[in-house]
Swiss-Prot record:
Keyword field: Repeat
Record protein name field: Pentatricopeptide repeat-containing protein At2g06000
InterPro entries: Mito_RNA_Proc_CCM1, Pentatricopeptide_rpt, TPR-like_helical_dom_sf
UniProt KW Heme keyword: no
Start and stop residues of the PPR repeats: 102-136, 137-167, 170-200, 205-239, 240-274, 276-310, 311-345, 346-380, 381-415, 416-450, 451-485, 486-523
Gene3D superfamilies: Tetratricopeptide repeat domain
């Protein structure tokens, strides 16, 4: 059938491409206008390879005469939504028909294969590309090294990187790989790559160092990042404002405000570069997190004097800082000031204010802001809900808290354990463990898995009600799903079992904890364990 169809299609192709007595205009009811004869061939070949690799002499002979690199590229492009079939065509045309494919065919198909997760096939194509004498450009190499690194194939990505040193603009390739590794939290791999392969190359630029500094600061290694700043000039690279902003943020994150402040002063002096809104916002954020609101406010005044206008982020940082410090009047003043600068309060602003009011016991004011948010058409996020739920539980308003939990689905908010845990804890402390169990069932139905805190709350709650067998059952479920109990969980359960005269169960439970020690299941402390054994 396929052979007959192909023969008919070939005849049709020749009719329109070579003219003669058989050639005639297309009818008015034809669905597709054929602009050139090659389009027919592209369509025929694409359709043919969707079903099978041609194996008849007729197909082979015809394709060997009429396929060329241009038509081959068009076929690959038509099959772009199915790269596996595109690879099948490329493999057939290269090895059976000796088609020398263009860079654009290799570029398109290797990208499509990677996007489909077919990295092994993409790797094969890349090797053939090199053996065919087709050189990749820096954009393709940059894409490939990032894609292979994301797939976990760092060895191949590194091999591609080493080849890029021969390509103009290799900095782009280097930075693509380093950036991918940092995004994947593989900062050690990024630094190892730099130390082993990049220190002795000329393909590093300021962006290279900025990526590494960002990665190190992100994992709390601001001091190590500072060392990179010191060696940049040796590579012919000068730090820019992004470099300094990243370091300031890193030191603030590590609670090293003195070092952040020193670097801020260097930038402010103009000896290295001029500060921008990110510089000031980073430093303000550091002071706010440390509770130094006077210094943070002073920096806001300073940046305004210099004509550096704050953004929503700047104001939100200040609102959050004052709210956490319990200075709600000042927090509200900042909200008013941000409007005067054309920065309008958003969900982050309101969430910080709600958190502040709940912290000082003014939950009703928090709900007034909640209503204001809804009136403005703002959608509360998971943190907004969590703050109010926790505040309600602290006031033993458990039914209202549960009502808020019920709104999550209608608001398209993905439920998280930290939203449910305060409510479960509240019902357990009130002795209503059955209600707590129902809530856990509800969260599991919503694909929200209980975490270590959830299980610990349930275990202690059941113990306090004397429901020891249920508590032990919850413990076994916790271990079975790979959630490792901590010392509080284990010691609380064992203590309750011993008090209930269930020494044998306590012994077996502690043995389970010891067996799971290598998997981070924490056994009972030795002294208590000995008491358990003695009781047995």
């Amino acid at each position: 059938m396929i052979r007959t169809t192909f023969a008919t299609a070939i005849a049709h192709f020749h009719t329109h491409s070579h003219g003669g007595a058989q050639a005639r205009p297309l009818q008015n009811n034809t669905r597709e206008v054929i602009h050139c004869p090659e389009a027919w061939l592209v369509k025929i070949v694409s359709t043919l390879f969707v079903y099978r690799v041609p194996d008849s002499d007729l197909c082979f002979c015809y394709l060997s005469k009429n396929l060329n690199p241009f038509i081959s590229f068009e076929v690959v492009k038509k099959l772009d939504n199915n790269p596996h079939i595109g690879f099948r065509f490329w493999e057939f045309s290269r090895f059976k028909l000796n088609i020398r494919h263009s860079f654009w065919t290799y570029n398109l198909l290797t990208r499509s294969l990677c996007k489909a997760g077919l990295h092994d096939l993409a790797g094969q194509m890349f090797e053939c590309m090199k053996s065919d004498g087709v050189s990749p450009n820096n954009r393709l190499l940059g894409f490939l090294v990032s894609s292979f690194a994301e797939k976990g194939k760092l060895h191949f990505a590194t091999a591609l990187l080493l080849q890029s040193f021969e390509v103009e603009g290799c900095c782009m390739v280097v930075n693509s790989l380093l950036n991918t590794l940092v995004k994947l939290d593989r900062v050690e791999d990024a630094m190892k790559l730099f130390d082993e392969h990049l220190r002795f190359q000329s393909c590093n630029d300021t962006k290279t160092f900025n990526i590494l500094i960002r990665g190190l600061c992100g994992v709390g290694k601001a001091e190590k990042a500072l060392e990179l700043l010191g060696v940049m000039s040796g590579f012919g690279c000068e730090p820019d404002i992004v470099t300094y902003n990243t370091l300031i943020q890193g030191f603030c994150k590590s609670n090293e405000l003195n070092k952040a402040s020193e670097m801020f002063k260097d930038v402010k002096s103009g000896s290295v570069c001029s500060p921008d809104v990110v510089t000031y916002t980073s430093m303000i954020s550091g002071y706010c997190k440390a509770g130094k609101m006077r210094e943070a406010s002073s920096l806001l005044d300073d940046m305004l004097r210099l004509g550096i206008y704050p953004t929503n982020v700047t104001f939100n940082v200040l609102v959050d800082g004052y709210a956490k410090a319990g200075e709600m009047l000042t927090a509200e003043e900042i909200r008013g000031k941000m409007i005067s600068f054309g920065c309008f309060p958003d969900v982050v602003t309101f969430t910080s204010l709600i958190d502040g009011y709940c912290r000082v016991g003014q939950v009703s004011q928090g709900f007034r802001l909640w209503e204001e948010m809804n009136a403005r058409g703002m959608f509360p996020n998971a943190f907004t809900y969590s703050i109010l739920i926790n505040a309600l539980c602290n006031e033993n308003r458990l039914l209202k808290a549960r009502e808020l939990l019920g709104q999550l689905a209608s608001k398209d908010i993905i439920p998280q354990p930290f939203m449910y845990n305060p409510v479960i804890d509240g019902f357990c402390k009130a002795g209503k463990v059955n209600e707590a169990n129902v809530i856990v069932e509800e969260m599991e139905k919503k694909k929200c898995k209980p975490d270590k805190i959830t299980f610990t709350i349930l275990i202690i709650g059941h113990c306090m009600k004397g429901r020891m067998f249920e508590a032990v059952s919850i413990f076994h479920k916790m271990v079975a799903i790979g959630c490792s109990p901590d010392k509080i969980t284990v010691s609380s359960l064992l203590s309750c079992l011993l008090k209930a005269g269930m020494a044998k169960e306590a012994y077996h439970l502690n043995q389970i904890a010891r067996k799971g020690q290598s998997n981070n299941v924490v056994p009972l402390e030795t002294k208590t364990a000995n008491a358990t054994l003695a009781a047995c």
